[in-house]
């Protein structure tokens, strides 16, 4: 065994062994329990960042741990390789998205291999390849045939100068990123999948996700947003028209003082013909955001339409206002406004001088709505026949009256909207629909799939090449001329079913059901909580679609979900001569000064600039505080980077990158190497004989097996990898202090090292692989079993008992592990220190906490 730890040499040899022996390639095996471990696959942006490394290290730790449990472990990897960044990079680099993407995949693939992740590379997929998206297109046509796909107009960002659709990221301060033209909202036809048809099941099945974080489940419940309410009809005074609104608070109906409708509502369009102010407002709203998040914070504005709604119960007329906070594509495009009991309605009413009436008050007092709306549930008043009813009774009474009079119905609504999957981009999977010469729209026949995306294109930064090339759209279906759809799929489509394709990545069908049902559901899924409401919901939805197509048997795609925290790093900047901030990489900071609490108070970069320190923030390009994993691997080795990632923080919390911590992890591995090196150079011929061990040897062995128990629980059940590492470090401290003078001393240290390299194998696999062989094991560590706790070793012959006299520790005594209270009390009373402090006192009370404490009260 070489004396010095040389990570680059060791890691290269071990990785070559894994590659040559296809160590992590797996097939279905009915005789073994399976375990499918999956980290969210990366977008091939060009280089891995530390967020990737944390995600994939966690996944690899779980996968390797389960492998040593004797399970058949699948851990695949692939590339979420369609998307807008490739188009932007292609424009900037004067290339096409395809070669840029494939080059990035190769580079990042090598980075992943250098980090030692145990992937089954034979299952690698890239979503931009026809072999993958062919089956996505096929499945979309099947969903269309089942009535789960439809086309309708929806709003997009439109640049009138370039005459092209812009992604949200391409709108900067309301203008086109390329030509600075003000962006408009334009209605164009788009394809949708009916996720709302599964809303109830998606909501109810959240209760079955026992292995998912509560925070993610709550976010999904809120996103789906089930509500029970009443849909009711208001007439329009002087017109033979009516419109519907939906409310979850029918108990407040008697307090309606105005109605707000979307600028795009048919009534607003009618009123605008004779109302120039309203017409201008409608045009303005057409070009403003439709994002709910932005609407929540923007100024609430409106214009009176001049129309009046007829209250469905009282017959009273209330004004109809067009308002910028009502969305035509959300609900009915109209809301009843009760400013006495809704704060947004209250503020709008105050702004425009509209009436405010109170109709709900607390059970035990009066209500004051002079400064703010009263939004709690309470008792109805000023509500005619409904006075005195509480929320539930008022809800039911008003709902029943509306239903009885044919003016309303009880209804369950969802906040969730159908999934718009059309994107007016190039670098995505073409949507497999065609329009025949007579205008009929049909799916592309299966024998014409895949609809290939041409990869040899020129990006002009304005229009999608497949939209610009009129010839590309021309095709024939059943002998008829037809035009292809030139929109491409939302890239969430690819990431919604990739996990299932890994089960049979080379199958000449979407999924091989036998293989899919062997591996699925995923046993452990790992990714960021930022995906809670988009990817993770589509992921669940797609699984149910696959189930209903007969391709999988399970109801949910993943049993357990771990959402890892972000990786943070120090962020520094200086102000340049133009007054702009220039962010400086932490690696380029030459000197820092810290206060007595370790906080940075001054920093200078390598060019002598005095820096402003802004604290720890998420590693990002914008703040130039990302740390290149490759630089760290070259400096310290992959095992050190992995160990730091697992030790520095619990997995769900943010991790603060500190190179001093990386150095500490490196020192620990060198300590382990040194201890193993010293041990293999000893005479280790004597086998362990537990019957001959001294009490000190038994105590050391007890620490070994306590550590095995703790690490097993920390990794396997609690997923607290940081405390698992801490437990091994503590055991190492015991071993380094232990004597190595007898054969049994060496035998115990040998047993301990055998356990340690397996306990650490999931985290630092290269050094563990090497040390396992150096310790004299015939087979490789991947073929070994996880260490098993010797329960007998945990049994203590004796206990150390703390003795207190009147609340102060006066002695510590050793007693037999099974000693009863009387025996412990007798031993305590004859201890010389206890006798000293009881001199002249009378014992009044003795309390014994078994195995821990003897407390004597005397006066």
From Swiss-Prot:
Protein's name in the database: Leucine--tRNA ligase
Main location: cytoplasm
Molecular function terms, GO-annotated: aminoacyl-tRNA deacylase activity; ATP binding; leucine-tRNA ligase activity
EC number(s) given by UniProt: 6.1.1.4
Motif ('HIGH' region): 42-52
Recorded superkingdom: Bacteria
Binding site residues for ATP: 621
GO biological process, one term: leucyl-tRNA aminoacylation
HAMAP family noted in UniProt: Leu_tRNA_synth_B
């Amino acid at each position: 065994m070489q004396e010095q730890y040389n990570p680059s040499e060791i890691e290269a040899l071990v990785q070559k062994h894994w590659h040559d022996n296809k160590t992590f390639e797996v097939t279905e095996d009915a005789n073994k329990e399976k375990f499918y471990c999956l980290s969210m696959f990366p977008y091939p942006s060009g280089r891995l960042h530390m967020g990737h490394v944390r995600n994939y290290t966690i996944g690899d730790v779980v996968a390797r741990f389960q492998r040593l449990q004797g399970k058949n472990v699948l851990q695949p990897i692939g590339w979420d390789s369609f998307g807008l960044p490739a188009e932007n990079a292609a424009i900037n680099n004067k290339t096409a998205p395809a070669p840029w993407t494939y080059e990035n995949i190769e580079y990042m693939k090598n980075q992943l291999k250098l980090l030692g992740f145990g992937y089954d590379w034979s299952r690698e997929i890239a979503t931009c390849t026809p072999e993958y998206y062919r089956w996505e297109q096929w499945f979309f046509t099947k969903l269309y045939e089942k009535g789960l796909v439809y086309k309708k107009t929806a709003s997009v960002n439109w640049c009138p100068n370039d005459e092209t659709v812009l992604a949200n990221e391409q709108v900067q301060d309301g203008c086109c990123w390329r030509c600075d033209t003000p962006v408009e909202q334009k209605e164009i036809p788009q394809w949708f999948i009916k996720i709302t048809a599964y809303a109830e099941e998606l909501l109810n099945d959240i209760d079955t996700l026992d292995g998912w974080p509560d925070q993610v489940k709550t976010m999904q419940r809120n996103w789906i947003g089930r509500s029970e309410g009443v849909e009711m009809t208001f007439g329009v005074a002087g017109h033979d028209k009516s419109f519907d609104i939906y409310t979850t608070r029918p108990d407040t109906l008697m307090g309606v003082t105005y109605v707000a409708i979307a600028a795009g509502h048919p009534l607003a369009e009618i009123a605008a013909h004779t109302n120039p102010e309203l017409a201008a407002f409608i045009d303005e709203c057409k070009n403003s955001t439709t994002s709910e998040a932005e609407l929540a914070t923007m100024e609430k504005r409106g214009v009176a339409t001049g129309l009046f709604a007829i209250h469905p119960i009282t017959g009273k007329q209330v004004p109809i206002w067009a308002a910028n906070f009502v969305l035509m594509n959300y609900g009915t495009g109209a809301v009843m406004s009760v400013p006495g009991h809704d704060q947004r309605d209250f503020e709008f009413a105050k702004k425009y001088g509209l009436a405010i009436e109170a109709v709900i008050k607390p059970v035990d007092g009066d209500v004051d709505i002079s400064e703010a709306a009263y939004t709690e549930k309470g008792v109805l008043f000023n509500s005619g026949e409904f006075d005195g009813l509480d929320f539930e009774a008022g809800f039911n009474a008003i709902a029943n009256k509306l239903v009885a009079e044919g003016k309303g119905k009880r209804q369950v609504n969802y906040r969730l909207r159908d999934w718009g999957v059309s994107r007016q981009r190039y670098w995505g999977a073409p949507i497999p629909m065609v329009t025949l010469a007579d205008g009929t729209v049909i799916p592309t026949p299966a024998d014409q799939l895949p609809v290939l995306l041409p990869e040899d294109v020129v990006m002009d930064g304005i229009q999608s090449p497949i939209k610009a090339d009129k010839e590309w759209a021309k095709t024939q279906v059943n002998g008829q001329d037809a035009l292809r759809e030139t929109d491409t799929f939302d890239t969430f489509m690819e990431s919604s079913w990739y996990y299932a394709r890994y089960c049979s990545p080379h199958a000449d069908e979407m999924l091989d059901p036998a293989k899919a049902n062997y591996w699925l559901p995923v046993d452990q899924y790992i990714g960021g909580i930022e995906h809670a409401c988009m990817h993770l919901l589509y992921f669940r939805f797609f699984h149910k679609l696959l189930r209903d197509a007969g391709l999988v048997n399970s109801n949910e795609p993943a049993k357990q979900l771990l959402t890892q925290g972000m990786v943070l790093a120090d962020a520094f900047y200086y102000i340049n001569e133009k007054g702009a901030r220039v962010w400086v990489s932490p690696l380029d900071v030459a000197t820092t000064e810290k206060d007595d609490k370790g906080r940075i108070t001054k920093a200078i970069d390598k060019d002598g600039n005095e820096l402003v320190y802004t604290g720890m923030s998420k590693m990002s390009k914008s703040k130039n505080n990302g740390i290149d994993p490759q630089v760290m691997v070259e400096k310290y080795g992959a095992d050190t980077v992995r160990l730091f990632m697992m030790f520095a923080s619990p997995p769900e919390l943010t991790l603060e990158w500190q190179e001093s911590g990386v150095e500490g992890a490196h020192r620990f591995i060198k300590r382990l190497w040194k201890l193993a090196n010293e041990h293999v150079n000893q005479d280790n011929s004597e086998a362990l004989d537990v019957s001959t061990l001294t009490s000190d040897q038994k105590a050391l062995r007890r620490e070994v097996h306590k550590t095995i128990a703790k690490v097993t629980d920390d990794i396997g059940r609690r997923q607290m990898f940081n405390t698992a590492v801490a437990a091994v470090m503590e055991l190492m401290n015991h071993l380094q202090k232990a004597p190595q003078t007898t054969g049994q001393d060496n035998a115990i240290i040998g047993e301990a090292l055998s356990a340690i390299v397996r306990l650490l194998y999931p985290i630092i696999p290269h050094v563990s692989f090497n040390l396992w062989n150096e310790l004299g094991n015939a087979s490789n560590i991947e073929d070994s079993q996880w260490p098993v706790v010797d329960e007998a070793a945990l049994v203590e012959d004796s206990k150390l008992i703390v003795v207190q006299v009147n609340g102060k520790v006066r002695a510590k005594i050793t007693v037999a592990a099974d000693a009863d209270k009387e025996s412990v009390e007798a031993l305590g009373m004859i201890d010389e220190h206890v006798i000293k402090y009881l001199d002249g006192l009378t014992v009044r009370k003795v309390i014994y906490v078994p195995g821990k404490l003897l407390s004597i009260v005397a006066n």
